[in-house]
Amino acid sequence: MGGTFDPIHYGHLVAASEVAHMFELDEVMFVPSGQPWQKGRHVSAAEDRYLMTVIATASNPRFSVSRVDIDRTGPTYTRDTVHDLHALNPDSELYFITGADALASILSWQGWDELFDLARFVGVSRPGYELGQEHITGVMGELPADALTLVEIPALAISSTDCRQRVEQRQPLWYLMPDGVVQYVFKRRLYRGPHGVAGTGRLTTPSLVVGNNT
């Protein structure tokens, strides 16, 4: 499962678990973004986001964490992520799992036309959005039926934005994310800066999930 994970929370974990079950995936790889190119806000340091993701996923044997985006220089583009994962797992079928709201903007992503040749897409519901055909426009509506699946994730009402704001406002994080991540956030004093985050000034991309099956 990929994205900024700033911070990772139970919404990410539930989405990954539900999609893994639905598509009988052997593994869900969480891929923290390195230097994302799209969202216009500051994010926490890549190593902090990577370590929080490792802590959050450690207890699930089906979950793993990849450094493929963090270790790549330059901005993080989904096309590069999927290409690299294909190279590392040439015999696997990849699934690109993202928020349903992000599907409407996918045509603006660099190399979007290559993505459907590399992976199947799964759009999951996110806070404040309803699944529907309005998320699929233009070229996307002409794709083969199995190229894109919409999935509603139960009780997916937690967001990273809310978690950051709760820290800034000195509100509790318990039960919104694994205990180890809560402890890491406070030990590292994350999300207490002027923008509600501590980090390197890098920008973020839409959340995504990449998994594979046999």
UniProtKB/Swiss-Prot annotation:
Keywords from the named record:
ATP-binding, NAD, Nucleotide-binding, Nucleotidyltransferase, Pyridine nucleotide biosynthesis, Transferase
- GO biological process assignments: NAD biosynthetic process
Does the UniProt entry include the keyword Nucleotidyltransferase?
yes
* Gene Ontology MF term list: ATP binding; nicotinate-nucleotide adenylyltransferase activity
Q: Which reaction does it catalyse?
A: nicotinate beta-D-ribonucleotide + ATP + H(+) = deamido-NAD(+) + diphosphate
Q: Look up the record and name the pathway of this protein.
A: Cofactor biosynthesis; NAD(+) biosynthesis; deamido-NAD(+) from nicotinate D-ribonucleotide: step 1/1
Highest taxon of the source? Bacteria
User: What are the EC numbers?
Assistant: 2.7.7.18
Matching PANTHER family, A to Z? NICOTINATE-NUCLEOTIDE ADENYLYLTRANSFERASE-RELATED (PTHR39321), PHOSPHOPANTETHEINE ADENYLYLTRANSFERASE (PTHR39321:SF3)
NCBIfam families given in the database record? cyt_tran_rel, nicotinate (nicotinamide) nucleotide adenylyltransferase, PRK00071.1-3
Say which family it is in: Belongs to the NadD family.
Q: What does this protein do?
A: Catalyzes the reversible adenylation of nicotinate mononucleotide (NaMN) to nicotinic acid adenine dinucleotide (NaAD).
Tell me which HAMAP family the record gives.
NaMN_adenylyltr
Q: What name goes with this protein?
A: Probable nicotinate-nucleotide adenylyltransferase
Q: Which organism is it from?
A: Mycobacterium leprae (strain TN)
